Amino acid sequence: DNKGLCETILNLNKNIASVAIINKQGRPIEKISRPEFINPFPDYMSELFCMHCVLQISMGRDFDEQYGPINYHISERPNMTLLTFPLADSVIVVSVSKNIGPISLAKKIAKITSNKEKN
């Protein structure tokens, strides 16, 4: 269940601002956020942003045979970090405040997503 997966990830750490599952067309199919972190984007910005995240993971899959599958992708910006994870035909996008080391968190989330794909 997508909502349960989003809640599980959000509850891993209080520095996680939001979790979204995006389909391969770049449309969110589930979103959850902490109220204290909400920073609204205009609809067109959210759509472009989601398509960017999907395209990034999708293009990376072109090299799975050569290098192995992507576990996660980290994008650090001045005021937030974005983590993206492949999940079957969708992508999980997690936004995180700058108060946490992204690699250890990304590894925890990747473990959850790989267990989800096995079930």
Regions found by a protein language model. Name each.
Residues 1-119:
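Non-catalytic interaction/Regulatory regions outside core domains
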